[in-house]
Curated annotation (Swiss-Prot):
Belongs to the aldo/keto reductase family. Aldo/keto reductase 2 subfamily. InterPro entries: AKR_Detox_Biosynth, NADP_OxRdtase_dom, NADP_OxRdtase_dom_sf. Residues 242-305 form a coiled coil. The keyword Ribonucleoprotein does not apply. Keywords: Coiled coil, NADP, Oxidoreductase. This is Uncharacterized oxidoreductase YrpG. Its EC number is 1.-.-.-. GO terms for molecular function: oxidoreductase activity. It is an enzyme of class 1 (oxidoreductase). NADP(+) binds at S215, P216, L217, A218, G219, G220, L221, L222, G223, G224, K225.
Amino acid sequence: MEYTYLGRTGLRVSRLCLGTMNFGVDTDEKTAFRIMDEALDNGIQFFDTANIYGWGKNAGLTESIIGKWFAQGGQRREKVVLATKVYEPISDPNDGPNDMRGLSLYKIRRHLEGSLKRLQTDHIELYQMHHIDRRTPWDEIWEAFETQVRSGKVDYIGSSNFAGWHLVKAQAEAEKRRFMGLVTEQHKYSLLERTAEMEVLPAARDLGLGVVAWSPLAGGLLGGKALKSNAGTRTAKRADLIEKHRLQLEKFSDLCKELGEKEANVALAWVLANPVLTAPIIGPRTVEQLRDTIKAVEISLDKEILRMLNDIFPGPGGETPEAYAW
């Protein structure tokens, strides 16, 4: 496994991040334990989750599964760089009228305590804002996070799904307080979704943030099975997406065959080739999927292959640099 620094921090993390969103939903607890053991055995020590995972009435279930795995011992917790998120409501009846989306000091304090309890740990390495809060002032948000960092319950703060200007605003407000602020941004990024190249990646590069890519396989479209799936089993939305990108996916599949590599691994290797990217998040449902995916870090894409991929999946922006989006 390869390792890199988490943004501008001195903390090193694996180039693949284990996503756990399926745990307790599509992946049962026993299989989730095996996946986490296998990941750690192969050097993947960067794990990502969120307090909302498990979804609906089961919100928090994924964190609980990870906590049970930590409780098995074997230095599991000590070996993992753990990231979780806050923002969404998790149907806690004690929250009353505050059971809503947001990043108030009240919510961050209460929901961090809930995450720590479910995860059976006393600290989180990377605590992430799952979305931007347009209502709560930055003074309150940063006061909440600073308090948790000073208490030792949180090491670093990250964001997720922020626009480029949100990152700049957040950092400017943190600097006023002489606080480190953000160290990462988690963002949707793949060969099929390159919008982040217009604003988010340039902002992250300038601010010294590591970018963690979610949905690097574009919801499975780049996984190699989309074109082979039974049309009768597809949802209307899925069928429309496949038809929209059919020509691109066919060309991509042909290129991967020439390279002798699986589509999913080439798609991940492309993300890894971007120097702004810390790691793509992989979300295996089975141990077998994880074993296949780990091979992505061994693939090196030369300039010609990167050019060919860019021809198949052109980035955004047109003729003007970064589209002058700001």
